[in-house]
């Protein structure tokens, strides 16, 4: 089985006023991949000055890691009220170039953990998608503008980005931002073969093969930071093993519930 990969910027996250801690899609996705035992590779980027703080917690998860040095480290502050989140972008992370993708040649499925629109330009995604590689993009890479300050989503993304995407994962507010609704026609208009909309404790919606299917979830206690990243990683593990999209979402829902409840 060819390995799955997660690529993206690591971040420093401050949750509810606490001390900064490692974050970013690669870190949260790696937690799910470790639990599921799927051969995988993690490629990350951040400033070298933060390497000692960010890299060891990721390496301890047991997956091979490719480090790419950047000019900055993405830094965020979060606060939560149930499923509602307020977020402050303190510093943007670096952009990924085609050269940063070296070492991913054998990968079949790639989770692109964009934290902002500037992380993965269309040219970089086009390179990732070569050779029938399947690219799964986090909707943060469409809706989060490349500016610091309180996070305000918008739909000013480059449509060329979606030409290279096989799976698009959107949070509910991201879907509403870019297409206005979360219904079948709205998600179809994106032109992506598979679209998964996560609804927090209410589960998810899966659009695939022209049909929209709801996937329920049971509310789970725990810090939800990174739950979407873990969900997408678990979803891709099942898809790469031959499971259908809806079945993959159900399995991913169970994995996230286990991680939030610290049962896995």
PLM regions: where:
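Conserved N-terminal subdomain of the carbohydrate kinase-like
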Residues: 2-3, 12-20, 35-114, 118, ...
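Short beta-strand/turn micro-motifs composed of small residues
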Residues: 8, 44-46, 139, 199
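Active-site metal-binding loops of divalent metal-dependent hydrolases
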Residues: 8-10, 230
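Conserved alpha-helical elements of sugar-nucleotide-dependent glycosyltransferases
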Residues: 24-25
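Alpha-helix C-terminal capping segments
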Residues: 30-39, 238-241
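Short beta-strand scaffold segments in enzyme catalytic cores
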Residues: 31, 76-79, 203-207
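Conserved beta-alpha-beta core of the PfkB/ribokinase-like small-molecule kinase fold
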Residues: 109-185, 203
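Conserved phosphate-binding/catalytic region of the ribokinase-like
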Residues: 152-156, 183-264
């Amino acid at each position: 089985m060819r390995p799955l990969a997660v690529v993206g910027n690591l971040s420093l996250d401050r949750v509810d006023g606490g001390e900064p801690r490692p974050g970013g899609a690669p870190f949260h996705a790696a937690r799910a991949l470790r639990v599921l035992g799927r051969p995988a590779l993690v490629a990350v980027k951040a400033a070298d000055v933060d390497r000692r703080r960010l890299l060891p917690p990721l390496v301890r998860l047991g997956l091979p890691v490719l480090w790419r040095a950047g000019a900055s480290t993405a830094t965020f502050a979060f606060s939560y009220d149930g499923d509602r989140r307020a977020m402050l972008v303190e510093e943007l992370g670096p952009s990924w170039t085609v050269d940063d993708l070296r070492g991913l040649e054998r990968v079949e499925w790639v989770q692109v953990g964009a934290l902002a629109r500037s992380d993965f330009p269309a040219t970089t995604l086009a390179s990732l998608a070569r050779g029938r590689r399947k690219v799964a993009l986090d909707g943060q890479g469409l809706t989060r503008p490349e500016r610091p300050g309180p996070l305000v989503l918008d739909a000013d993304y480059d449509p060329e980005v979606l030409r290279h995407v096989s799976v698009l994962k959107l949070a509910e507010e991201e879907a509403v931002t870019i297409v206005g609704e979360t219904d079948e026609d709205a998600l179809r208009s994106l032109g992506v073969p598979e679209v998964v909309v996560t609804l927090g404790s209410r589960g998810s919606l899966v659009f695939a093969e022209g049909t929209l299917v709801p996937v329920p979830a049971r509310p789970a206690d725990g810090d939800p930071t990174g739950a979407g990243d873990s969900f997408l990683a678990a979803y891709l593990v099942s898809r790469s093993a031959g499971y259908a999209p809806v079945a993959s979402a159900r399995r991913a829902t169970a994995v996230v519930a286990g991680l939030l409840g610290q049962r896995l």
